[in-house]
């Protein structure tokens, strides 16, 4: 579903000093991301600490960000769960709030079969009018959704695309070759954006775009317009920064970077912890080599 955009940022969830969600700062961040290259935003995905944000907080964040963004960009609600019924109910609530699409992660911990994955996503998609984006991230979910399952799911009309974060480029090529023509594939790893574009993907659902959104957008636009040398140069330039943002579990590094740069997003909820000094020093050193696109003040 190409109207959702080529560059989508998976937003962090800002917290106040008392640990409650800072909805006003989430709105400010959303607008800043749109001002620095993002076409759309994922609200309460992995980067948004979905495991430790309550359903009520999630729904309030969906509403707050959609209210702030209006028609300036697309809002994609992270509504996935490892319970089909919970994911379905959360998706229906997001639809009622008025978001533009939903992101549905592969169920984690309970390790469903490929048939279970198919039925999970089919059940949710058939219950909602929202465009549904699949999310394959086996490094977090353990279960890998096979290309054959994705291809099968792509025949369901409102399953419109996939965030592919497996890093398995052979599988991704098989998906791109066999899904229906309007099914959209986004990279789910910043480091794979350009390689996947070369294979026929559409864009990226990014973490690094919190900081360098305009530069990532330039890379994508350059590649699509045929200026592959410029796109490759940007990719090489951004690689050290991207590496530093994943030196420990996301979103620990990106939250540290934003706070360090002066855009306050608060801490993390346990069991996630803040960056230790070794990690913080590495991120600070990495940031020195880059122009930051996000409006900080």
Swiss-Prot record:
InterPro entries reported in the protein's UniProt record: Aldolase_TIM, DapA, DapA-like, Schiff_base-form_aldolases_AS, Schiff_base-form_aldolases_CS
Pfam families: DHDPS (PF00701)
Molecular functions (GO terms): 4-hydroxy-tetrahydrodipicolinate synthase activity
Gene3D superfamilies: Aldolase class I
Gene Ontology biological process: diaminopimelate biosynthetic process; lysine biosynthetic process via diaminopimelate
Sorted UniProt keywords: Amino-acid biosynthesis, Cytoplasm, Diaminopimelate biosynthesis, Lyase, Lysine biosynthesis, Schiff base
Site for Part of a proton relay during catalysis, residues: 46, 109
Active site per database record: 135, 163
Entry EC number(s): 4.3.3.7
Amino-acid positions noted as binding pyruvate in the UniProt annotation, renumbered to this chain: 47, 205
Gene Ontology CC terms, in alphabetical order: cytosol
Pathway(s) per entry: Amino-acid biosynthesis; L-lysine biosynthesis via DAP pathway; (S)-tetrahydrodipicolinate from L-aspartate: step 3/4
Catalytic reactions on record: L-aspartate 4-semialdehyde + pyruvate = (2S,4S)-4-hydroxy-2,3,4,5-tetrahydrodipicolinate + H2O + H(+)
PROSITE patterns: DHDPS_1, DHDPS_2
Compartment(s): Cytoplasm
Subunit annotation: Homotetramer; dimer of dimers.
Function: Catalyzes the condensation of (S)-aspartate-beta-semialdehyde [(S)-ASA] and pyruvate to 4-hydroxy-tetrahydrodipicolinate (HTPA).
Family: Belongs to the DapA family.
HAMAP family reported for this sequence: DapA
Record protein name field: 4-hydroxy-tetrahydrodipicolinate synthase
Organism whose genome encodes this protein: Dehalococcoides mccartyi (strain CBDB1)
């Amino acid at each position: 579903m190409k109207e959702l955009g080529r560059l989508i940022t998976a937003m962090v969830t800002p917290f106040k000093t008392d640990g409650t969600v800072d909805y006003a700062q989430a709105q400010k961040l959303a607008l800043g991301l749109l001002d620095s290259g993002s076409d759309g935003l994922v609200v309460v995905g992995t980067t948004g600490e979905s495991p430790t944000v309550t359903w009520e907080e999630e729904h309030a964040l969906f509403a707050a960000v959609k209210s702030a963004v209006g028609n300036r960009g697309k809002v994609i609600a992270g509504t996935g769960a490892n319970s089909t019924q919970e994911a379905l109910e959360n998706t229906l609530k997001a639809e009622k709030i008025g978001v533009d699409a939903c992101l549905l992660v592969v169920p984690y911990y309970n390790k469903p079969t490929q048939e279970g994955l198919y039925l999970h996503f089919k059940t949710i998609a058939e219950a909602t009018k929202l465009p549904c984006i699949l999310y394959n991230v086996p490094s977090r979910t353990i279960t890998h959704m096979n290309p054959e399952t994705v291809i099968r799911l792509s025949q369901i009309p409102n399953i419109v695309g996939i965030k592919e974060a497996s890093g398995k480029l052979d599988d991704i090529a098989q998906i791109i070759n066999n899904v229906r023509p309007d099914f959209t594939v986004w990279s789910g790893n910043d480091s794979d954006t350009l390689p996947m574009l070369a294979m026929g993907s559409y864009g990226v659902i990014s973490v690094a775009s919190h900081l360098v959104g305009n530069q990532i957008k330039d890379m994508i636009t350059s590649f699509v317009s045929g200026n592959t040398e410029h796109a490759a140069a940007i990719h090489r330039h951004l690689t050290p920064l991207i590496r530093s943002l994943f030196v420990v579990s996301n979103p620990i590094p990106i939250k540290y970077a934003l706070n360090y740069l002066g855009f306050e997003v608060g801490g993390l909820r346990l069991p996630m912890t803040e960056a230790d000094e070794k990690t913080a020093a590495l991120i600070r050193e990495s940031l020195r080599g880059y122009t930051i696109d996000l409006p900080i003040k």
